[in-house]
Amino acid sequence: MVKIRLTRVGAKNKPAYRIVAMDSREPRDGKHLEILGFYDPKTDPATIQLKEERILYWLSQGAQPTDTVLSILKKYGVWDKFLAMKTSAKSSA
């Protein structure tokens, strides 16, 4: 199963994270399929860069976001776009 999750990058005591699509059986910092964004919680406010189009693609292909990534997607409106896209596809079918 493909998951959209965080992988840690950055120095010791200065974590930053990449938002990636990867197989759920891979270790946290293992081989990823695609980099979908960046998250730095140490800045004020937290720095987040998202590739919305690619995230929506992976979600439409059945990728499951982790709880942390889901909260980021909801905060920036990507999850709402996905749900709207999903319901519009259902109603047109």
Swiss-Prot record:
Disulfide links within the chain: none
Keywords for this protein: Ribonucleoprotein, Ribosomal protein
PROSITE patterns on file: RIBOSOMAL_S16
GO molecular function: structural constituent of ribosome
One Gene Ontology cellular component: small ribosomal subunit
One Pfam family in the UniProt entry: Ribosomal_S16
GO biological process: translation
PANTHER family recorded: 30S RIBOSOMAL PROTEIN S16, SMALL RIBOSOMAL SUBUNIT PROTEIN BS16M
Entry's family note: Belongs to the bacterial ribosomal protein bS16 family.
Protein's name in the database: Small ribosomal subunit protein bS16
Species the sequence originates in: Dictyoglomus thermophilum (strain ATCC 35947 / DSM 3960 / H-6-12)
Encoding gene per record: rpsP
